Amino acid sequence: YRRKLFRLRDPYDIEASQDLFLQAVRENCAYHYAHCGEYRAILEHFHFSPETLRCETDLARLPALPTAFFKGREIYSMPRGRQLVRATSSGTKGQMSRIGFDAGGLLCGLEMVVRIAQRHSLFSVRPAHYILLGYKPHRGNQTAVTKTAFGATLFTPALSRTYALRY
């Protein structure tokens, strides 16, 4: 369902996406429930299971995991070998949370970004100078915000990339 949701022709079509969204959340919840003991324990503590997600109003019952939870521990639902891209939070308070993306998740995200960029005419062959309000990417900086900011410069050929922050 995730792939179908991310491949919708019109990303803003609520009617077409509502049922797919619910099914994708249920599918995602079931995956993490089956592959991550820590996540399963949290859901069970709140008497929640993926099958509980039957209608849109059930989404509000899905236990939220605060950012602080991930800063204090590393939990994964997939082996590190399947994580093609790893990123961290900025760690502004001294602790970073970590996330990994597999090929399927990256492809879904890329397809949606391309679809939205096309819809808003963001692609161009005309070169541009980019000013990024963030850090320049390098091996020591694995923050997701840096990777995302760099990705935003791929919509049109870059004449230059100027970064506002120094690492």
Segments predicted by a language model, with ranges:
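Active-site phosphate/ATP/adenylate-binding loop shared across adenylate-forming ligases
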Residues: 1-19, 60-167
